[in-house]
């Protein structure tokens, strides 16, 4: 068992979880194994490629594909929000995440620490799934108090 913690919240008929980057504090292989055992249908990676490479996690997408887990890589700078030109990819990810959750599946979102970028994406997904912003944020912060670290992330998450 790794030290990776999955912070889960029910959304729709499914489960949405936030976590830190696999391999951040321990073995990438062990963390990956724990994620696979959790059985997500969809994983969203928000770290930049250099962050993955620094922790020997550069082939994470290949690892997920090998076991049939759908994966989206939306690199976003630490403490940042998506760039305008990245919005179509984010829109596609949110639509996919909501679809998986409404079908009763599990969706995992991770950044480096599992707080700011992950919280921003999770809140946006929860709102897109039909939740009101404030109750969704409250539920999210019950499981992950550090979810969303900047006012820019909060504004971006709440805009649809």
Question: PLM features: residue spans?
Answer:
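Short beta-strand/loop segment at the start of cytosolic alpha/beta domains
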Residues: 1-11
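Homeobox/homeodomain signature
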Residues: 6-8, 61, 105, 116
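Cysteine-based protein phosphatase catalytic domain of the PTP/DSP
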Residues: 13-106, 129-156
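A phosphate-binding catalytic loop at a beta-strand-loop-alpha-helix junction
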Residues: 101-123, 127
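Short beta-strand-to-coil "C-cap" segments at the C-terminal boundary of structured domains/repeats
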Residues: 158-160
